[in-house]
Swiss-Prot record:
Binds 2 magnesium ions per subunit. Residues 184-329 form the KARI C-terminal knotted domain. Substrate binds at S253. It catalyses: (2R)-2,3-dihydroxy-3-methylbutanoate + NADP(+) = (2S)-2-acetolactate + NADPH + H(+); (2R,3R)-2,3-dihydroxy-3-methylpentanoate + NADP(+) = (S)-2-ethyl-2-hydroxy-3-oxobutanoate + NADPH + H(+). Mg(2+) 2 binds at D192, E228, E232. It holds the Pfam family KARI_N. This is Ketol-acid reductoisomerase (NADP(+)). The gene is ilvC. InterPro entries: 6-PGluconate_DH-like_C_sf, KARI, KARI_C, KARI_N, KARI_prok, NAD(P)-bd_dom_sf. PANTHER family: KETOL-ACID REDUCTOISOMERASE, MITOCHONDRIAL. Its cofactor is Mg(2+). It comes from Rhodopirellula baltica (strain DSM 10527 / NCIMB 13988 / SH1). Its EC number is 1.1.1.86.
């Protein structure tokens, strides 16, 4: 079934006229969406904790940030753009009791609403508008007259009026210039988590480390292993980004393409796909969400320890030195 996609003519900014939009959290998505909405003529207020770098950033962008509670109370449309792991507590402490009937509660990732960590009271519609790109790209494309495609989803029982508000919001941030795909909270949340865990983050990280370790353990120089298993990944990803698998294969050597066909299926096997299906089931059934919520309530000991350990892996250590040889890279360290 073909996706339903909305464009500029399908959305009307007048549905936000006379409404105050609160952006809660002035991070990557918050700063981009807030500025784009303001430039589109919408009335925007910012909820951000005083004393933080993002508070100062909002001030430098011409906003007058207030507390989360104050921004919620003052707004008609409230978009929660805070980190997933803190949303539920902040919702209970500062948002829930400051909502008024008829408000629209928004997010750009459905984790907390889909998994029941945020359960709005009766009379509050929920809405998701999710740009499919990082905040800096959402902002820069808007400024150039373009827009990053986005997703839109309505919560259970949400009205047609809320849908029109969502489309207006998407237009205000530039989404309808690229196209806004209709989805559901479940689909956005579950596919997002699956992609992160199986391919984009978990899958790629483990593939890179395993490839690097295999070469080093076989006696090859770690510098060579880094180039072949980490550094050159960007070249391939850029080709995929621009033209998909076919363009990538068109652009590489015939030797590399042949190796792709004969060796790829030996690495990603039927057993791998079966494990992917298990991961998807765990996401769908809420098992991953329960683990992540429990981890954070305990102070995130596993998460923090694993983060520290992963930074000591050989591919990370050798990369620090090699990237300093590449003056065209805007090197980042954490």
């Amino acid at each position: 079934m073909a996706a339903t996609i909305y464009y500029e003519n399908d959305a009307d900014l007048s549905h936000l006229k006379g409404k105050k939009v609160a952006i809660l959290g002035y991070g990557s998505q918050g700063h981009a969406q807030a500025q784009n909405l303001r430039d589109s003529g919408c009335e925007v207020i910012i909820g951000q904790r005083p004393g933080s770098a993002n508070y100062d950033l909002a001030v430098s962008h011409g906003f007058e940030p207030m507390s989360i509670a104050e921004a919620t109370k003052a707004a008609d449309v409230i978009n929660v753009l805070l980190p997933d792991e803190v949303q539920a507590d902040i919702y209970r402490d500062s948002i829930r009791d400051n909502l008024s009937e008829g408000n629209v509660l928004m997010c750009s990732h459905g984790f907390n609403i889909h998994f029941g960590q945020i359960d709005p009271p009766k009379g509050i519609d929920t809405l998701l508008v999710a740009p499919k790109g990082p905040g800096h790209l959402v902002r820069s494309e808007y400024e150039k007259g373009g827009g990053v495609p986005a997703l839109i989803a309505l919560g259970e029982g949400a009205s047609e009026t809320t849908k029109q508000i969502g489309l207006a919001y998407a237009k205000g941030i530039g989404g309808t210039r690229g196209g806004v795909i209709e989805t559901t909270f479940a689909e956005e949340t579950e596919t997002d988590l699956f992609g992160e865990q199986v391919v984009l983050c978990g899958g790629v990280s483990e593939l890179v480390k395993a490839g690097f370790d295999t070469l080093v353990e076989a006696g090859y120089q770690p510098e060579m292993a880094y180039f072949e298993c980490m550094h050159e990944l960007k070249l391939i990803v850029d080709l995929l980004y621009e033209g998909g698998l076919s363009y990538m294969r068109y652009s590489i050597s015939n030797t590399a393409e042949y190796g792709d066909y004969v060796t790829g299926p030996r690495i990603i096997t039927d057993e791998t796909k079966a494990e992917m299906k298990k991961v998807l089931e765990e996401i769908q059934q809420g098992e991953f969400a329960r683990k992540w919520i429990s981890e954070n309530r305990a102070g995130a000991p596993f998460f923090k320890a694993t983060r520290r350990r992963e930074r000591l892996h050989g591919v990370e250590q050798i990369g620090l030195g090699l990237r300093r040889m590449m003056n065209w890279i805007d090197e980042k360290e954490v």
